[in-house]
Amino acid sequence: MAKTSTSVIVAKTLVHAAALAPIALLGWQFWQVWQSGSDALGADPVAEIEHRTGLWALRFLLITLAITPLRQLTGQAVLIRFRRMLGLYAFFYATVHLAAYLTLDLRGFWTQIFEEILKRPYITVGFAAWLLLMPLAITSTQGWMRRLKRNWGRVHMLIYPIGLLAVLHFWWLVKSDIREPALYAGILAVLLGWRAWKKLSARRTKARRSAPPQATPR
């Protein structure tokens, strides 16, 4: 087993700290609102909590998708070591986002979630994205990679429809100003477009190499 360098350990520690900073700040502001009724979370604290946690889930999802293109562009294979961590943070924030909706918005009437899923399309796609994230989080360990073998890669290709569903969830949720969801949709389009281009280029290269040599005219 390869040893993890000190620089990677330090970098991972910094990434953990940065990834936990948004939820730590949100927790502190929620505590202020709970204790003193301050306006630390604005006029609608529940909406603010749901918005922030959902936004960070989407951001971490896109950052996770950006790891492979960044590795290919920079040649820094060490970036792959951060992909699992970032993907798990996407699932973490998505789960907090869902929990906030269930406990603060529905106020514990969780059976209403099924009615909401059927009635509101943005909740339908958002809940579907969270459900698809779950098997990715569960199978993210080395043990599951060994068990699933080639199927592991197939399972984790779910991240592509998850990205589409997450952006669509945000887009449909916004009622008027779509600039922010459009920005994230553009980033997702670039990340998926890069993968499609690389795959097409690889196929063309393979086809050229396997093509029989043409006879030289006399």
Swiss-Prot record:
Pfam family, one: Ferric_reduct
Main location: membrane
GO biological process, one term: protein repair
GO cellular component assignments: plasma membrane
Record-annotated membrane-spanning stretches: 8-28, 60-80, 86-106, 121-141, 155-175
Named cofactor requirement(s): FMN; heme b
UniProt-listed InterPro entries: Fe3_Rdtase_TM_dom (IPR013130), MsrQ-like (IPR022837)
Membrane topology: Multi-pass membrane protein
Keywords, in A-Z order: Cell inner membrane, Cell membrane, Electron transport, Flavoprotein, FMN, Heme, Iron, Membrane, Metal-binding, Transmembrane, Transmembrane helix, Transport
Compartments where located: Cell inner membrane
MF-aspect GO terms: electron transfer activity; FMN binding; heme binding; metal ion binding; oxidoreductase activity, acting on diphenols and related substances as donors
Cofactor note: Binds 1 FMN per subunit.
Record keyword Transport present: yes
Function noted in UniProt: Part of the MsrPQ system that repairs oxidized periplasmic proteins containing methionine sulfoxide residues (Met-O), using respiratory chain electrons. Thus protects these proteins from oxidative-stress damage caused by reactive species of oxygen and chlorine generated by the host defense mechanisms. MsrPQ is essential for the maintenance of envelope integrity under bleach stress, rescuing a wide series of structurally unrelated periplasmic proteins from methionine oxidation.
PANTHER family linked to this entry: PROTEIN-METHIONINE-SULFOXIDE REDUCTASE HEME-BINDING SUBUNIT MSRQ
Oligomer and partners: Heterodimer of a catalytic subunit (MsrP) and a heme-binding subunit (MsrQ).
Family: Belongs to the MsrQ family.
UniProt protein name: Protein-methionine-sulfoxide reductase heme-binding subunit MsrQ
Chain's gene name: msrQ
